[in-house]
Amino acid sequence: MMDLELPPPGLPSQQDMDLIDILWRQDIDLGVSREVFDFSQRRKEYELEKQKKLEKERQEQLQKEQEKAFFAQLQLDEETGEFLPIQPAQHIQSETSGSANYSQVAHIPKSDALYFDDCMQLLAQTFPFVDDNEVSSATFQSLVPDIPGHIESPVFIATNQAQSPETSVAQVAPVDLDGMQQDIEQVWEELLSIPELQCLNIENDKLVETTMVPSPEAKLTEVDNYHFYSSIPSMEKEVGNCSPHFLNAFEDSFSSILSTEDPNQLTVNSLNSDATVNTDFGDEFYSAFIAEPSISNSMPSPATLSHSLSELLNGPIDVSDLSLCKAFNQNHPESTAEFNDSDSGISLNTSPSVASPEHSVESSSYGDTLLGLSDSEVEELDSAPGSVKQNGPKTPVHSSGDMVQPLSPSQGQSTHVHDAQCENTPEKELPVSPGHRKTPFTKDKHSSRLEAHLTRDELRAKALHIPFPVEKIINLPVVDFNEMMSKEQFNEAQLALIRDIRRRGKNKVAAQNCRKRKLENIVELEQDLDHLKDEKEKLLKEKGENDKSLHLLKKQLSTLYLEVFSMLRDEDGKPYSPSEYSLQQTRDGNVFLVPKSKKPDVKKN
């Protein structure tokens, strides 16, 4: 045989290519081009696709490396969960000032940031627990004077004001203490350069300045030269939009409280009593007692003002005093709008709100009874006699036994006029909702309430002026219905509506009858099922009794069998063995002693 050279299995032969060329010329609509059958062309496309895939993988790898390098420069914030750039350790530069209260600290550059262990070691080296470096108690007592007992709260010294010559001379410290202070500043610089403490964002200007206190030999009268720490500079941004008149009144009243001739007037009772006052009324009392100096030109004495302030903060709060506050002022419409429907027991000499019921318990119980009803049922209850409550006058409820008097004659007159208007309101007028100022228009309410109970067929029959009721159209027999229809003349629309009403009514009645029959059948089946269950229980009970009696009979029979078998004897007078013999009874009633057949023993090979 001749060996034929076969082309590789993956490559088409020349004969196949010629056949494909012939077929393509005969039918161009093969759906594919000739390049598809060209293996070299397909191989080039495969190599090109492979190169694109490798290039794509290379780009993805490069992007992953860039992301890895980018995230290496970030740190995760544990509080917010976002990535933040790692900030290098920045050294805090201290500001230099000409004042004696500020110390000059030179900037110490650091090549590497200190960590916590290095910092602790540096602290141990700087402040060793040795008696040589400790300051003696006498030196400490000479530097730190005793604070007078009448000054309970710490008083800060204003650093932006010039000090007296005696104070500046008294603040001169020994040389060794200056060196220790510089060491402390240097340690603070190194502490704040730790990366773990960068999140604190502590600056030198926010740190508490350490100032020297004059020795006890200085006169106690120098307290008058000090200026108490005022909260006005910190409030300049908040009260910047206020008028100068208000700021002047604030400064006068605040300075009159603090700038006293005798420091003993700053008692603990007056300083700490503001802790017992509710913070909700802080701004109200604040505006109340600072407005007095602006009204009168004469300033009260410091002792009287301190005594009145302590009484105001420690004494019981009167309801009439609260009416001065803006939250209880009747002249503010925004505050009165919030308490239109208030159920509070405190009466502030204001008229009852028209929008709310006279008693909240009555309104809540009335609303609960109407909660599960439909709109039509609610309207029926509204229209029923006795359902509308009579708005009689009621005595207002107060928290105290005395009546609260109005603050001014004009204000009291306005409230009395408003009460008179509320009493003269007609009783038949419906209560309005909180968003309305007038009573709703109720002219057509009765007719709409009646139409709400009509069905769709009744409304259509009423619109076409059909003189017969819908129930009569549906329920009349055929003869009576035809006789009724012959007595009247109807147009096509009326006839079509009457037929439609009767047809749908009959269908409805038929459906109701069908459902009724189905329900009756279901009830009958339930009764049959209950009867079968009772019969089953009865049969099971009888079966149990029969089984019990049968078991008793078997027991009696076995007892009789053993008794008869024990009475039998052989020729020798010996009893028969029950394992070898048995008693059997024939149909005629005779009993025979039959030996039991023994099975022959089969030996297994």
UniProtKB/Swiss-Prot annotation:
Annotated GO MF terms: DNA binding; DNA-binding transcription activator activity, RNA polymerase II-specific; DNA-binding transcription factor activity; DNA-binding transcription factor activity, RNA polymerase II-specific; molecular condensate scaffold activity; protein domain specific binding; RNA polymerase II cis-regulatory region sequence-specific DNA binding; RNA polymerase II-specific DNA-binding transcription factor binding
UniProt biased composition (Basic and acidic residues): 416-430
Chain positions found as Phosphoserine: 40, 215
Activity regulation (UniProt): Activated by cell derived metabolites including itaconate and fumarate. (Microbial infection) Transcription factor activity on antioxidant target genes is significantly inhibited by SARS coronavirus-2/SARS-COV-2.
Sequence motif DLG motif, location on chain: 29-31
Glycan-carrying positions: 462, 472, 487, 499, 569, 574
Chain segments carrying region Disordered: 334-449, 571-605
Claim: Coiled coil is one of the keywords in the record: no
UniProt biased composition (Polar residues): 334-354, 579-588
Outcome recorded upon mutating residue 569 to A: Loss of function
N6-acetyllysine, modified sites: 596, 599
Domain bZIP: 497-560
Stated consequence of mutating residue 462 to A: Loss of function
Compartment(s): Cytoplasm, Cytosol; Nucleus
Reported impact of residue 587 to A: Loss of function
Outcome recorded upon mutating residue 82 to G: Abolished interaction with KEAP1
Region (Mediates interaction with CHD6 and is necessary to activate transcription): 591-596
Disease note: Immunodeficiency, developmental delay, and hypohomocysteinemia: An early onset multisystem disorder characterized by immunodeficiency, recurrent infections, developmental delay, poor growth, intellectual disability, and hypohomocysteinemia. Some patients manifest congenital cardiac defects. IMDDHH inheritance pattern is autosomal dominant.
Name of the protein described by the UniProt record: Nuclear factor erythroid 2-related factor 2
Species the sequence originates in: Homo sapiens (Human)
Lineage: Eukaryota, Metazoa, Chordata, Craniata, Vertebrata
